[in-house]
From Swiss-Prot:
PANTHER family, alphabetized: HISTIDINE BIOSYNTHESIS TRIFUNCTIONAL PROTEIN, HISTIDINOL DEHYDROGENASE HDH
Cofactor(s) in the UniProt record: Zn(2+)
Pfam families in UniProt: Histidinol_dh
Gene behind the chain: hisD
UniProt entry tagged with the keyword Kinase: no
Pathway stated in the Swiss-Prot or TrEMBL entry: Amino-acid biosynthesis; L-histidine biosynthesis; L-histidine from 5-phospho-alpha-D-ribose 1-diphosphate: step 9/9
Key words, A-Z: Amino-acid biosynthesis, Histidine biosynthesis, Metal-binding, NAD, Oxidoreductase, Zinc
Protein name, as recorded: Histidinol dehydrogenase
Length: 398
């Protein structure tokens, strides 16, 4: 199904589930582990014997993993690690007018990673969140993910958890997992920040606990905007649109093109799909860029002749695929993260990197302050009514 005009809003309204999620959070806060056992049995239809996966349990599950999948995980791990190691910032120091100053970077000490699960498990999500956290030297990493129908940990997830060296894995999912990581229970450690994607209940829970714990963001359904000119292959464009539609019925997929023939050929390949695709004919590529920057999509593909030049004009996008690069490869092995901002949040932040797990601490050492700076600091303190601030400064340097 094709629409030739963009909707006013994208689907990301979790207000309808807020009352239910509030009750879940309150239950976990008051009943702790008992609530987690009850909710897992009620919502996931699984009875678990223990919340925290035992070390032997993880090893046993990991041993069941197909060797080809192990190799794929190992290969992806090295590529993602190389990308995030490139981003580690140095400590910086300098000075001006008698004052030494600088920034030192420190890791967040404890984080929680939520890994969704359903018909399939998503070990790539644990790689995407866990690798930058490890590169950032986070001391304690705790993972929560729904249990399998057998009440244990998915083999691929267990393998990645062992490879990353995470501290603990919890066999809990949904809003109750977010609440447990935010407030702690008898079995679940309380963390300082929670990252990872999830359904509307998970997002609502992250929103509700964000006053007591850091979060990476509130995310909606997957988004893809494609800007394509006459050099693009319709087959690739259509495949990429259909690929992102696999994420669910609410995915937001847009083709912006100034080429009538390309649009016609793409239409032929997607017109019978039940999924809604948006196709917009633009006057030129500059108009396409303007629309894309307003949308601020999670994924942006530039199927154009000079992709690097066009990329210089993009200011709002979670991740950009250049030329014939399929967005799907970013979901796995390209290097950039697949945990990306949606619903316009790319206007103010990007995907998960080491910067989500470190924080800058600024310092100053005042030695031989010049008279102008000294007088300025005392005058400003007095003007704002902080008289003793001024005296504290003056006592040392006047």
């Amino acid at each position: 199904m094709i629409s030739y005009s963009l909707p006013n809003e994208r689907p990301n309204d979790f207000s309808r589930v807020i009352p239910v999620v509030k009750d879940i959070i309150e239950s976990v806060k008051t009943k702790g582990d008992n609530a987690l056992y009850e909710l897992t049995e009620k919502l996931d239809k699984v009875k678990i014997d223990n919340i925290k996966a035992r070390e032997e349990e993880l090893k046993t599950q990991a041993s069941k993993l197909d060797p080809k999948v192990k190799q794929a995980i190992d290969t992806a791990y090295e590529q993602l690690k190389a990308f995030h190691e490139m981003l580690v910032p140095p400590n910086i120091g300098g000075g001006y007018q008698g004052i030494s100053f600088g920034v030192i970077w420190r890791s967040i000490e404890k984080i929680g990673i939520y890994v969704p699960s359903g018909k399939y498990s998503y070990p790539s999500t644990l790689l995407m969140a866990g690798i930058p956290a490890k590169v950032a030297k986070v001391k304690e990493i705790y993972v929560a993910s729904p249990p399998t129908q057998e009440g244990t940990v998915n083999p691929a997830l267990a393998y990645v958890a062992i490879k990353l060296g995470v501290n603990e894995v919890y066999k809990i999912g949904g809003a109750q997992a977010i609440a447990a990581l935010a407030f702690g229970t008898e079995s679940v450690k309380k963390v300082y920040k929670i990252v990872g994607p999830g359904n509307v209940y998970v997002q609502a829970a992250k929103y509700l606990v964000s006053s007591v714990v850091g979060i990476d963001g509130i995310e909606g359904p997957t988004e893809l905007v494609i800007i394509a000119d006459e050099t693009a292959k319709a087959e690739y464009v259509a495949l990429d649109m259909k690929a992102q539609a696999e994420h669910g019925p609410d995915t937001y997929i847009v083709l912006l093109s100034n080429d009538d023939e390309l649009i016609r050929r793409v239409e032929e390949k997607i017109k019978n799909d039940k999924k809604i695709y948006y196709i917009i004919k633009t006057k030129n590529l500059d108009e396409a860029i303007e629309i894309a920057n307003k949308i601020a999509p999670e994924h942006l593909s530039l199927y154009v002749k000079d992709a690097y030049t066009l990329m210089d004009k993009i200011v709002n996008a979670g991740a950009i695929s250049l030329g014939n690069t399929p967005p799907a490869i970013i979901d796995y092995v390209a290097g950039p993260n697949h945990i990306l901002p949606t619903n316009g949040w790319a206007k103010i932040r990007g995907g998960i990197t080491v910067y989500d797990f470190i924080k800058p601490t600024m310092y100053a050492n005042v030695r031989d302050i010049n008279k102008q700076l000294l007088e300025a600091s005392i005058s400003l303190a007095n003007y704002e009514g902080f008289i003793i601030h001024g005296k504290s400064i003056g006592a040392r340097y006047e």
